[in-house]
Swiss-Prot record:
Gene: htpX
Annotated Zn(2+) binding sites: H130, H134, E201
Disulfide bond sites: none
HAMAP family from the UniProt entry: Pept_M48_protease_HtpX (MF_00188)
The protein's name: Protease HtpX homolog
Length: 313
């Protein structure tokens, strides 16, 4: 079923790409857009994960360079029955994380230094379990390719302003078509990202909680990350907004207008769902859910030794 949804999504994004090409250059522009979209779909399948990691300046780590973080991911991957993914760190003060890769055998997870410094080991485990749930649900291919195509569609809409005004370009709609391409194309791509991310985040939250066995670890992490995302601007995400839906929390929340078209479900609703799930597990709320300030620092923080210890500490 996931493969069918992915195929339908790629078909829609390709059709949107062709529609923008038609608005810019008529039937000739549409055919050129089709060729470009087909090439991008093929290229994205093999390279989108590398492109996204490069956009955010992710650096691969191992058990020597980041022992506790790496061990958390390794233990969770074993619990989920997944191959060990490649593990990356992003030097960014905003706490956040994402997963990418075309399949579980070629998956990668990435966490920011802000996340590793500000979250407890248990909360980091909750976040990484969520990302591994995306890998297990095979969301990563769809989400990564969508990020690449959405960025291309937005760029094509911008090109319309510069190249669409030529009278010889066979544009049947004239300047009106150019305006439509500039405005509607990026919005349509954003709506697709919203539809993908909002439904899959809830599923990944639930499966991630099952993997780590503690729904409130993830709930506590979401509360901390959401608060910080409104205060700390993620510069790389602002430069590449098409990748926003990959992250566990919208990285664009530091800007005032970004919540208007948020790619993520409401954080409070996600936390409430996890708390309800914790009721089934018989868990008690951790302190960080009841306080405004973050708790003990995480695997790379100075006070990690004072944090409540769990299986991955």
């Amino acid at each position: 079923m996931n493969m069918i949804r992915t195929a339908m999504l790629l078909a829609f994004m390709t059709a949107l790409f062709m529609a923008v090409g038609y608005l810019i250059g008529g039937s000739g522009g549409m055919m050129i857009a089709l060729v470009i979209a087909a090439a991008m779909n093929l290229f994205s399948y093999w390279n989108a994960d590398k492109m996204v990691l490069r956009m955010h300046h992710a650096v691969e780590v191992d058990e020597r360079s980041a022992p506790e973080y790496y061990r958390i991911v390794s233990d969770l991957a074993q619990r989920a029955g997944l191959p060990m993914p490649r593990v990356y760190v992003i030097d960014n003060p905003q706490p956040n994380a994402f997963a990418t890769g075309r399949n579980p055998q070629n998956a990668a997870v990435a966490a920011t230094t802000g996340l590793l410094h500000s979250l407890t080991p248990e909360e980091v485990a909750g976040v990484m379990a969520h990302e591994l749930a995306h890998v297990q649900n095979r969301d990563t291919l769809t989400m990564t390719i969508t990020a690449t195509l959405a960025g291309a569609i937005s760029m094509l809409g911008n090109f319309a302003f510069f190249f669409g005004g030529n009278r010889d370009n066979n544009n049947p709609f004239g300047f009106i078509g150019i305006l439509v391409a500039m405005i509607v194309a990026p919005l349509a791509a954003m709506v697709v990202q919203m539809a993908i991310s909002r439904t899959r985040e809830y599923a990944a939250d639930r499966r991630g909680a099952e993997i780590c066995g503690q729904p409130l670890w993830l709930a506590s992490a979401l509360a901390k990350i959401s608060r910080a995302a409104h205060r700390v601007v993620n510069v790389d995400a602002e430069r590449n907004p098409a990748t926003a839906h990959l992250f566990i929390i919208n990285p664009l929340s530091g800007q005032r207008m970004d919540n208007l078209f948020s790619t993520h479900p409401n954080t409070e609703n996600r936390i409430a769902a996890l708390q309800a799930m914790a009721g089934e597990f018989g868990n008690a709320p951790p302190a960080s859910l009841r306080e405004d300030e973050p708790g003990a620092d995480g695997p790379w923080g100075r006070s990690a030794s004072r944090a409540r210890k769990g299986p991955w500490s």
